[in-house]
Amino acid sequence: GMAKEGFTPFATTYAVFGTRRAYDFIHQVIAEENLNVKIACALPGLTTGYGPSHQATEDLAMMRGIPNLTVIDPCDALDIEQAVPAIAAHRGPVYMRLLRGQVPLVLDEYNYKFELGKAKLLRGGRDVLIISSGLLTMRALEAAKELEGGGADVAVLHVPTIKPLDEQTILREASVPGRLVVVAENHAAIGGLGEAVASLLLRNRLAPEFRQIALPDEFLDAGALPTLHDRYGISTSAIVASLKSWL
């Protein structure tokens, strides 16, 4: 109702509630009518230890499948700060993941600029290209820094807009010869950024060596987050170990 009257409503809740419980309403009322509603949801992916009832590990897959809906996954406080006015200015429905609590700053606050629909190369590297979003961009940068000492040169391409995907930038970076391409995401391996990138590469007949760092296709455990991130392979140390095993 507010959107039809010319307002720009922002709705916020936990990601499990804003996607699973509200899915039909978002699909049939907001997206089908292309209403200017912004849905900002906290605790995406594995960012809570409360178990499957609170872990929105499939939210990107659900939201990517809805026509007209733009999907955003910022990586830190600066990204969120810049993304909010950008999605407010965008005409149409948006789903944005939110990191909760004290969110670190990992981007360059002087040189970074969020642009809707654009991926950003945060660092170059000749050996590995990590394509990531959200929390996993944070971890990818940490892993790249740690691997410098071992002689591995790791590039990080941050993809804050999951839909529409910045196909041109991804194809350009994935076309660099000799680099291992790794997609890292805080989401189930099915239906998220990894499958979107894999489909893009296949449709454009690009066949780099390709790996995926993602959550498994299962209901995840409850527990302390550091333990769960190690268990499911998305902690910095787990990412470093995976990259070393692939190089």
Where are these regions (language model features)?
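Conserved thiamine diphosphate
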Residues: 1-129, 200
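Thiamine diphosphate
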Residues: 47-48, 99-247
